[in-house]
Amino acid sequence: MDTPLVTDDLDRTLAEQVLTLAEAARAADGVAPLSEHTLLRVRHGAPSGSSRFHLALEDGRAVGFAFVERVAGEPDSGEVVVHPDHRGRGHGTALLHSVDRDAGPDGVRVWAHGRTPQAVSVAREDGWTAVRELHKMRMPLRDIAGDEPGGPWEAPELPEPELRPEVAERVRLRPFVVGQDEQAWLAANARAFADHPEQGQLTLDDLLQREVEDWFDPDGFFLATAKDGGVAAFHWTKTHADGAGLTDGEPVGEVYVVGVDPEWQGSGLGRALTLAGLRHLRDAGLPWVHLYVDGDNEAAVRLYESLGFAMWDTDVMYAPPRDDAPRPNV
């Protein structure tokens, strides 16, 4: 087997092949193997020095792919996918080894989405260990019948969001305005996620790329703005036209990201904006909403459970064996 090709840039042909194999894996496994961020990097390219693309090739065609994002002072963060028709040939292991060899000074971590048997098997056989979990939670926005996927399940009540009087005097809730709110939102996002490298370091280019995606809807992007024009908190919702594995193709919603500026923590804005977004998705006629939350964020899990969400699935981040640890012979 050839060593995977490693590059800082993908030409259009390879990018299309990666998108095709990722869709084939999603259809076979029932879970998307690559995050939205990775797919945007494949489609639009990445800033110089920020990313690495690893490709397993057969007859010049991409049959396996790994993406690695580099953030200074943090371990590289990656994802790996192999086309369903080309599994069992060592491509997954070869890509993991390639990512590990190419890692930056702080090492590398790799996500496995949905705990698919193939991903878990490859990681364990090669000595990688789980170091982080990202829970997926779901909630119905209408009553789900017993003969529907996920049913039966009665939708919870979603009360109108209310702000405490002392908070309501200082902020107002409104939708995001394209061309006006980008910089204020980026500043608030960086403060809210200062300890979260994947989310907290989003750039203007990252935001603008999302604004031209088919799913983007500023009316579903809720801000709490202070009198000085700054963003105190926000809730960005998203609609998945393909059902995101929750339906047989009927669109569903997502709590895409909720953030609160540290100065506004404890104000109740997070809950109020979450409710505003959920009611927006419900009123759009969507049957389900889902979200992602870090496994160690117990406060957020409790908040979402209090609103009616329940655990659905888990993504797992793996770390490679220590340098002095023997690798299994696979």
From Swiss-Prot:
PANTHER family: L-AMINO ACID N-ACETYLTRANSFERASE (PTHR43617), MYCOTHIOL ACETYLTRANSFERASE (PTHR43617:SF31). Keywords: Acyltransferase, Repeat, Transferase. CDD domains: NAT_SF. It comes from the Bacteria. HAMAP family: MshD. It holds the Pfam family Acetyltransf_1. 1D-myo-inositol 2-(L-cysteinylamino)-2-deoxy-alpha-D-glucopyranoside binds at E36, E198, K238, E254, Y292. Acetyl-CoA 2 binds at residues 258-260, 265-271, 297-302. Residues 142-161 are annotated as: Disordered. Catalyzes the transfer of acetyl from acetyl-CoA to desacetylmycothiol (Cys-GlcN-Ins) to form mycothiol. Its EC number is 2.3.1.189. Acetyl-CoA 1 binds at V80, V81, V82. Residues 5-142, 171-328 form the N-acetyltransferase domain. This is Mycothiol acetyltransferase. GO terms for molecular function: mycothiol synthase activity; protein-N-terminal-alanine acetyltransferase activity. Monomer. One of its GO terms (biological process) is mycothiol biosynthetic process. It is an enzyme of class 2 (transferase). PROSITE patterns: GNAT (PS51186). Belongs to the acetyltransferase family. MshD subfamily. It catalyses: 1D-myo-inositol 2-(L-cysteinylamino)-2-deoxy-alpha-D-glucopyranoside + acetyl-CoA = mycothiol + CoA + H(+).
